[in-house]
Design a protein with these regions (language model features):
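Active-site C-terminal subdomain of aminotransferase-like
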Residues: 2-89, 174, 182
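Generic low-polarity alpha-helical segments
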Residues: 1-2, 148
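Conserved C-terminal alpha-helix-loop-beta "cap" of PLP-dependent enzymes
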Residues: 61-72, 76-182
Length: 184
């Protein structure tokens, strides 16, 4: 509890929650530990996601696919685009990412007519938190130029596993010939 002058109580409320919201958001009831842990872990998690994006760009560029940004370009977010030029490539990539998921890895994502899109879309995200963009995920519209958008990985190792599983899925689907990987 905090007791004292109104102005001091208000300052405490802003300090313990957020400026401008203060007491209006109510008690935090034990969630502050999770917030602070998130702040503490954020640099490590973002670093892992960025390393995963660079790894994906490097591999897919070396085997002949167009990637944006490329492996050596300056980065301003965690999203990595890979253009496959075919629906089969987008689908196999997303299915490989889903297979590496910590949640629902047994699910096989399929393209579908999602509201708000002008084409079918496929999404892979076996995440702990639905809609989390920092967790390993991939999605893409099933239309030319057939690009997929990869992001996340709570750890570098998980991002790497996702990319390796995506490669295996592309090989299994006949999109990539295994001999292309010899140069890696």
């Amino acid at each position: 509890y905090v007791a004292g002058k109104k102005e001091l109580i208000e300052n405490c409320a802003y300090r313990l929650t957020s400026p401008g919201l203060g007491k209006e958001v109510g008690a935090s009831l034990g969630v502050m530990q999770s917030f602070y842990q998130g702040f503490f872990m954020a640099p490590t998690v973002v670093c892992g996601a960025l390393k995963g994006a660079v790894f994906a760009a490097n591999i897919y560029e070396k085997i002949g696919y167009s990637v944006v940004p490329n492996a050596s370009e300056s980065r301003h977010d965690i999203i990595q685009a890979v253009t496959f030029g075919s629906a089969d490539g987008v689908i196999a990539f997303c299915q490989g990412i889903q297979a590496a998921a910590p949640v629902d890895s047994y699910v096989t994502p399929e393209p579908w007519a999602m509201p708000g899109y002008d084409s079918e879309v496929i999404m892979a995200a076996g995440a702990f938190v639905q809609g989390s963009s920092i967790e390993l995920s991939a999605d893409g519209p099933i239309k030319p130029p057939y690009a997929v958008y990869f992001q996340g990985g709570l750890t570098w190792q998980h991002a790497k596993l996702g990319i390796l599983k995506s490669l295996q899925s592309l090989i299994d689907a006949g999109v990539i010939d295994r001999s292309k990987l010899q140069s890696l």
